[in-house]
Amino acid sequence: AGSMDSCSETGVCMKACSERIRQVENDNKCPAGECICTT
């Protein structure tokens, strides 16, 4: 398992999130190219 698609905590912006844990509607709160974690 790669650490790139795991989230350390909810609401954290990451460079790479797996589709099942990202919250697309909140990606705009993150820097460009990053996604927000929801788990």
UniProtKB/Swiss-Prot annotation:
First and last residue of the signal peptide: none
UniProt-annotated site: Basic residue of the functional dyad, residues: K29
Tissues showing expression: Expressed by the venom gland.
Annotated S-S bridges: C7-C30, C13-C35, C17-C37
Top-level taxonomic group: Eukaryota
Compartments where found: Secreted
Keywords: Disulfide bond, Ion channel impairing toxin, Potassium channel impairing toxin, Secreted, Toxin, Voltage-gated potassium channel impairing toxin
GO molecular function: potassium channel regulator activity; toxin activity
Keyword Secreted annotated: yes
GO cellular-component term (any): extracellular region
Transmembrane segments: none
Other noteworthy facts: Negative results: does not inhibit rKv1.4/KCNA4 and the sodium channel rNav1.4/SCN4A.
Domain notes: Has the structural arrangement of an alpha-helix connected to antiparallel beta-sheets by disulfide bonds (CS-alpha/beta).
Function: Voltage-gated potassium channel inhibitor. 1 uM of the native toxin inhibits rat Kv1.2/KCNA2 (100% inhibition), and drosophila Shaker IR/Sh (100%), human Kv1.3/KCNA3 (83%), rat Kv1.1/KCNA1 (32%) and rat Kv1.6/KCNA6 (21%).
Family recorded in the similarity comment: Belongs to the short scorpion toxin superfamily. Potassium channel inhibitor family. Alpha-KTx 31 subfamily.
Protein name (Swiss-Prot/TrEMBL): Potassium channel toxin alpha-KTx 31.1
Species annotation: Buthus occitanus tunetanus (Common European scorpion)
